[in-house]
From Swiss-Prot:
Involved in oxygen transport from gills to the various peripheral tissues. Residues 2-143 form the Globin domain. It comes from Gadus morhua. The gene is hba1. SUPFAM superfamilies: Globin-like. This is Hemoglobin subunit alpha-1.
């Protein structure tokens, strides 16, 4: 699913509105993913605590959202723009690419909760397209 120029503008506008709360969104979305999809906890077994609000969850939630912010700036070529991140997840972290979609779903839920007026159907569609493209780009090195 490719992003149209209208989709890109919508993503940039929405990101501009919500980026101030990106850290909170990331922590909440990661907490939700770990609770709803407990199999994802295996990637974080080295953390002291997987509880919502734990320092590790907050820190990684922030890292995730910084990565998404980076993807927003690289929407024109996600595959090339996220190549280093794809290599990291494929070869070092060995994350099952299915988890990119699971996390995306949880981020969408949190965005909808935190920004009910801004997260319109058009914003939802555009951000979901970005997340689909991001998941494909991150899975590139798995092929």
């Amino acid at each position: 699913m490719s992003l149209s120029s209208k989709d890109k503008a919508t993503v940039k506008l929405f990101w501009g509105r919500m980026s101030g709360k990106a850290e909170l969104i990331g922590a909440d979305a990661l907490s939700r993913m770990l609770a709803v999809y407990p199999q994802t906890k295996t990637y974080f077994s080295h953390w002291k605590s997987l509880s919502p609000g734990s320092p590790d969850v907050k820190k990684h939630g922030k890292t995730i959202m910084m990565g998404i912010g980076d993807a927003v700036t690289k929407m024109d070529d996600l595959e090339r723009g996220l190549l280093t991140l794809s290599e990291l997840h494929a070869f070092k972290l060995r994350v099952d690419p299915t988890n990119f979609k699971l996390l995306s779903l949880n981020i969408l839920v949190v965005m909808a909760i935190m920004f009910p007026d801004d997260f319109t159907p058009m914003a939802h569609l555009a951000v979901d397209k970005l997340f689909c493209g991001r998941a494909l780009a991150l899975a590139e090195k798995y092929r």
